[in-house]
Amino acid sequence: MKGMRSLGFAVVAVGLLAAACNDSESYSTPAGTPYDPSKPVEFYTFEPDSGGMRTKCIIKGSNFGTDIENIKVLFNGDREARIISSNGNMIYCLVPKQAAGNNKVSVVIGKDTVHSEKTFAYSVKELVTTVVGKNNEEGYVNGSLGEARLGWISGLALVTGNNLIISERNFFRVRLAALEENQVITLMEGSQYGKPAVTKDRKTAYFIGYGSPHTIYKFEQDNLWQPRRVVSSIPGFDGIIQCAAFGPNEEWLYFRDNTGKFGRLNLEDPGIVEVLNEHCGDTPNATDSHLIWHPQMECFLMSLEFAHGIYKVSLDGKNVEIFAGFNGIGGQDGYLNEAQFTSPMGMAIDRDGNIYVAQVQNHIIRKISYPDGLVSTIAGYNGQSGAVDGVPYKSRFNGPWDIIIDDEENFYIGQFWGSSVRKLSIE
């Protein structure tokens, strides 16, 4: 019976795959029964009952309809599956990324929502790989992703086309790594830049010059990622600026220099520059800092390299509060008031509000769970540098300086001394 059941599932899958036309999974409406709002939607079962991200799944029931624009399949409450096709009684979909565990599955057809009695056992796979350059081999070489050699990475941006824009501190260059085309090229030479601000559509990245006069360049998809100067200087800011950031919208570009001055520049009228706070956070040893807007908390998070902690900063810059760290140097995990950080730098935030921090001096990646504030080490080993790929707890990094997140919530990590880009895949 078990073999017959598996065979039946395979036949159904083949039929629905055929309806989806081709390997690219583009959709065309298959023959089937349209949705009838006068009848109930029924959810019988689904197969398989376990797997990971992108597992092919068949949902069985009745009155689903054939219009995939009117169908949603949700795992674990709010994780939406990609719908490939439906014949009215069976939906073919791809399992979305979600938390590990036994998760509920729901089908939404128009205004009707139905739930399965059984759960889907989702398993998470985690892996660290090197995607650009060679670990601990600094240099200047363009070419394929593996042949390319990079300098000390001080900023990363993920833009459209699955392209990475990379700034190099020591070589005064901005590079582009085309992940799909397997190619690395140089976009600009002669200036130092840190982490850019990237628009939500990922079509534009703004870089602020590291040192005064802080020339701002933008790199746009419409201009084939070639640099265009926005302004030649930011008046009133004489210290080093490591990071540019957007707030809740893209009207203003925010930044903080290493004298502690926090401000913003209006992108519609770049002549408008405002100093929001003259003394934003501690400034030990003229430290570098990173900024990122946290949408759920509705504030900036600001990491300070040699203060070994992270601040919360209000949008107007007036309220600055300790958020995490400032408990001495170390890698102790725990809640916000007890965890230790060593030189936190680049930060990324996932859709649930969890915060990921690259720690350059002790070579690890940390996670701050939102909203409970639990700090954990998710990759690398405290105080040990290296160049080991593989499962996260066995991986080793060399100066992870920046971290960014893609649309599937995988992470790219730019290494300062390691001179390479690593990828932390969580599926």
Model-assigned labels for residue ranges:
Residues 17-20:
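C-terminal motif of bacterial Sec signal peptides marking the signal peptidase cleavage site
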Residues 398-427:
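Blade-level signature of beta-propeller repeat domains, shared across WD40, Kelch, NHL, RCC1
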Residues 172-176, 214-218, 260-264, 308-312, ...:
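A short loop-to-beta-strand structural motif that recurs across blades of beta-propeller domains
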Residues 59, 124-154, 181-194, 222-242, ...:
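Gly/Pro-rich loop segments of beta-rich domains
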Residues 161, 168-169, 208-212, 249, ...:
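Short loop/turn segments immediately following the C-termini of beta-strands
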